[in-house]
């Protein structure tokens, strides 16, 4: 009984100790379990969580988004507004902006200065304390050169684009840390990020009419006149009719002669406005008609041929009139004994 009570008392006395141990573990867990970045293979600086729940450094995610806009592990797409509104795992931004020492390193931005992240600041301070003229920094997957004599930074493979840097006290007004704004709660508009991985400012997207609607079809120019593609130009229609007139010239003349009768002269009325054909054409037509009238069998055959030619439509305004008026071309019609017509141009 005593042993049992002693064991029971011992187990009871151990409970607070275990509870205290659990409490101490829970309190020290955030400081011990610092997430590691799978991109830079170091402990995360300003860790952020993507929608896929993978954790990286903010600058590492920024560099990866410029290259592929996908998660480095699962290849899930990174949202467009993630860099403007990242999901920080710990509210350490303002504490990081205060720093641990008296001085901090800054790089130039629009209307203000950005503070370097802690890791890059340590590298710059170490190079500055050793009296180096320059040092290289790996930021968001890009190699940058910090010129400590001229106090500028630039990409190692792009010397033309330079940004001023400075070493100043920790309490100066600043925009944020490594591209993370201190006023994250402020209302921000959708911004078009420029191609800068070191925490550069964003450029507002131009809301002008730079993108035109592609639903409106452009106007086409025909003979110096703007016309819609759906509306044919009258000049184009006239030229098509003129070219088509040469093909139907023989058929229209045959239909007109069938109305007048065989052997009748083809003098046109003044209202038609057609240029009369040369005398050679009339003489050939009359001689052929007289020879056909002497042969009765030929007349019967010609009459049947005329009945077939009556089926050819005769428009209200013959296209031959427009062809003669527009081009000034006089065609000579002649009829062969076999009833076929030929068209020759003079």
UniProtKB/Swiss-Prot annotation:
One of its GO terms (biological process) is protein K48-linked ubiquitination. Residues 202-216 have a biased composition (Low complexity). A zinc finger (RING-type) spans 37-75. One of its GO terms (cellular component) is cytosol. It is an enzyme of class 2 (transferase). Residues 195-240, 256-301 are annotated as: Disordered. This is E3 ubiquitin-protein ligase RNF146-A. It comes from Bos taurus.
């Amino acid at each position: 009984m005593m042993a049992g009570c002693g064991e029971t008392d011992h187990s009871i006395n151990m409970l607070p100790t275990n509870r205290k141990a659990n409490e101490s573990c829970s309190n020290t867990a955030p400081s011990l379990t610092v997430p590691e970045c799978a991109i830079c293979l170091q402990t995360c600086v300003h860790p952020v969580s993507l929608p896929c729940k993978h954790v990286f450094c903010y600058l590492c995610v920024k560099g990866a988004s410029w290259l592929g806009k996908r998660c480095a592990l699962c290849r899930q797409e990174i949202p467009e507004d993630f860099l403007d509104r990242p999901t920080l795992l710990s509210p350490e931004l303002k504490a990081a902006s205060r720093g641990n020492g008296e001085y901090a390193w800054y790089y130039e931005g629009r209307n203000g200065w950005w503070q370097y992240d802690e890791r890059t600041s340590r590298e710059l301070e170490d190079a500055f304390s050793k009296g180096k003229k320059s040092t290289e920094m790996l930021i968001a997957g890009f190699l940058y050169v910090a010129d400590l004599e001229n106090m500028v930074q630039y990409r190692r493979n792009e010397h033309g684009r330079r940004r001023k840097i400075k070493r100043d006290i920790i309490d100066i007004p600043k925009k944020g840390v490594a591209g993370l704004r201190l006023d994250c709660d402020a209302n921000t508009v959708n911004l078009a990020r420029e191609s800068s991985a070191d925490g550069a400012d964003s450029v507002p997207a131009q809301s002008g009419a730079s993108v035109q609607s592609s639903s409106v079809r452009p106007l086409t120019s025909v003979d110096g006149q703007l016309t819609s593609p759906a509306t044919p130009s009258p000049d184009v229609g006239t030229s098509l009719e003129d070219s088509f007139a040469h093909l139907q010239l023989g058929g229209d003349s045959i239909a007109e002669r069938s109305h007048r009768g065989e052997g009748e002269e083809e003098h046109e009325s003044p209202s038609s406005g057609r240029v009369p054909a040369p005398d050679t054409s009339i003489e050939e037509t009359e001689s052929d008609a007289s020879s056909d009238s002497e042969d009765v069998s030929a007349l019967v055959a010609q009459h049947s041929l005329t009945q077939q030619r009556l089926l050819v439509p005769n428009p209200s305004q013959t296209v031959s009139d427009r062809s003669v008026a527009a081009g000034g071309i006089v065609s000579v019609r002649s009829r062969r004994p076999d009833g076929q017509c030929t068209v020759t141009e003079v």
